Amino acid sequence: MLFVWSKLKHIWRMENRKMILITGAGPNGVTGHLIKDKLSTKYDILTPSSKELDLTNDEEVDFFFRGKSINYIIHCATFRSNHNISHFVDEELESNIRMYFNLAKHAHEVEKMIYFGSGAEYDKSKPIIEVSEENVGLHIPYNKYGLGKYVMNTDCRRSQNIYNLRLFGTINKYEHPNKNIISNICLKLANNIDVTLKRDCRFSFVDINDVITIMEYVMANDLNHHDYNIVSDDSYLISEIAEKLIVISGKQSRLLFEQSGCNLEYSASNNRIKAEMQNFKFTDINYSLYDVFNYIDMNKDMYDIKSVDSRWNVHSNGQYPLGGGKINLYYIAAA
């Protein structure tokens, strides 16, 4: 009898689970895929690929929503100019705005829509220093990506149930070294080569697992605002992050920069989200860095160290300098 009752409760829970549409949860969508894995035991999850659902095509999106009882939209998909050239439109700014508004059009059908904004909304052509949400709009973003996110945030603030979780730097062990500077540093250390970077910079970071915890809070609770900076309590220089990782790795790699000084700061205040979640504690950055390094160290053979792009790396005549070469490097630290 106890077994039957337990089985009935399980069936009831399964039948009454809420449904989430997560965009950008395909094999290349690191954040969306991680959210899917974290929430799949609690919710029914819909994760159409870009081939199954072109979010830039309003007719396809309208058709997708027909007959579905979706409770939440988690919008993680981001269009970059080198992605999916078969889209209904193929220009970065227009594509990102179309994706957002094609989903926002259906926000009245769901409890909440959540998407991930960017610190680029504050305009990365200028220093962004401990900015609060009230600073959005003081400068209109110069680049297309930031402008698109700025337009979305303007609409989000006027909405009834759309929320912007604004990210700056994320710490995520699944991020590819081509796309994330912390993963980039970890891969170099795992391969016992010098950490060579272009220039130092101060960032605000957050552990991706904290982002998911905050997202779940937003789903379940009434909020006072519609956009929040999601960053941990302290900002860090890239050199400070690298030095922590050198200690964690136990390697004898050097930390080298091509240029002295610092690039434009990219940091934010988290006072608004902390006022909402007064008992929440952000993950200690040392724990987060340890987790990323261990994962990349164990999986370093998945990556081609020579193919790591030039976004943060020092290059000489198109060659990747494995810890040296005839380059005018600015040496700042050693293990």
Where are these regions (language model features)?
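C-terminal substrate-binding subdomain of Rossmann-fold SDR/epimerase-dehydratase oxidoreductases
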Residues: 193-335
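NAD(P)-dependent short-chain dehydrogenase/reductase
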Residues: 142, 150, 154-203, 208-212, ...
